[in-house]
């Protein structure tokens, strides 16, 4: 019995670690989160007067709605909790900034604003 306890503890720790690691997101989910992160970064830049962000149309309610709907849809479909969705969004935002990819992704994402199914089944 004494030998089983460490094995069970190791298995429990392994299961806990596995549960904390989110399943890989689909390409559709990653793009929704990537657009959400890009919209958030640009909107923040617009609020702070960043010249690069001001080159885009004003991102207001429509971009916020996209962000909320996309995050909720990905949480539901991918089984993420709030911590998981925050981590996924932060990772996408970091990647956009680290690879100077905001401009190219905005070209893809901006047309999605206002589309009936752009972020999550309106």
Please give the residue ranges for each predicted region.
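Short N-proximal segments of mature Sec-exported proteins
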Residues: 24-77
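N-terminal signal peptide c-region/cleavage motif recognized by signal peptidases
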Residues: 13-19
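Compact alpha-helical subdomains of small soluble proteins
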Residues: 54-122
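Generic hydrophobic alpha-helical segments
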Residues: 7, 42-43, 116
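Sec-dependent N-terminal signal peptides
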Residues: 4-13
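Transition segments tied to proteolytic processing and entry into folded domains
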Residues: 20-25, 31, 48, 85-87, ...
